[in-house]
Amino acid sequence: MASAKATMGQGEQDHFVLKSGHAMPAVGLGTWRAGSDTAHSVRTAITEAGYRHVDTAAEYGVEKEVGKGLKAAMEAGIDRKDLFVTSKIWCTNLAPERVRPALENTLKDLQLDYIDLYHIHWPFRLKDGAHMPPEAGEVLEFDMEGVWKEMENLVKDGLVKDIGVCNYTVTKLNRLLRSAKIPPAVCQMEMHPGWKNDKIFEACKKHGIHVTAYSPLGSSEKNLAHDPVVEKVANKLNKTPGQVLIKWALQRGTSVIPKSSKDERIKENIQVFGWEIPEEDFKVLCSIKDEKRVLTGEELFVNKTHGPYRSAADVWDHEN
């Protein structure tokens, strides 16, 4: 089965060609935990730094601001067809009858007629107003097959170009593939040298599903930009640790969506083309020990005494 592949033209940003044939820019601007200046960051990323890929989600609470930034960029002369916009449906809307209305709200907030990629944010359904952590009865049964069929209908109706999944396990991915008429084009997962997520990564490669890496620098508790191994490679290559971590993801064959609200960092994060991490240094980065996920999903889905998920291991099907 054909897999997504990277391409680059002179002076152009790297892209990955998805199974659908659509081109996905390899570096996108992440907007998780973005602030009130999100519109400015999006416009700056596109018009000044050269980004053509913006990743957001309904649950981030910034889609309206992202929409303002996209509109400003297009008013500045950027064609919509040259942009790749990703969003995600939240867990409270993971019922077949809620899929289309959820997307329509996203399109309205983003001020767009279509989006390029629409993800299932997490493969779990939550009751409206669910607490963190969830109380008894707030994690509901998820009709994965029914929801995916409605996602497929969005593609058929031209509202979405590609559909994908986030935070899936191999078990859940295999279940979805058994019924999907349009397989997921992309699987978005936490990935960095401190959490390589090899099992789902290899499963996606087997099925020709492209992988996007989120949290490429780790977390505030374990910021890999301060890891001595990363710093040593960065100093050797005369790059920043952040650039090295982003490049590591690209050389691994994944797209990547670093987030920053600082103009200087936004520009720095996309200056990762035209150079390579040498093989010996790449192997050194790969040797960083896997420690823990940034996002376990525990506070969202785990009730230790009631409900289907009593631990983070349950959330991840005890796969890692």
UniProtKB/Swiss-Prot annotation:
UniProt keyword terms in alphabetical order: NADP, Oxidoreductase, Stress response
Induction or repression: By abscisic acid (ABA) and gibberellic acid (GA).
Claim: Transport is one of the keywords in the record: no
Binding-site residues for substrate, renumbered to this chain: H121
EC top class named in words: oxidoreductase
Catalytic activity: an alditol + NAD(+) = an aldose + NADH + H(+); an alditol + NADP(+) = an aldose + NADPH + H(+)
EC number: 1.1.1.21
InterPro entries assigned to the protein according to its UniProt record, in alphabetical order: AKR, AKR4C, Aldo/ket_reductase_CS, NADP_OxRdtase_dom, NADP_OxRdtase_dom_sf
Catalytic residues of the enzyme: Y60 (proton donor)
Binding positions for NADP(+) per the UniProt entry: 215-269
KW NADP (keyword) present: yes
Site (Lowers pKa of active site Tyr): K88
Residue ranges the record marks as coiled coil: none
PANTHER family according to UniProt: ALDO/KETO REDUCTASE
Protein name: Aldose reductase
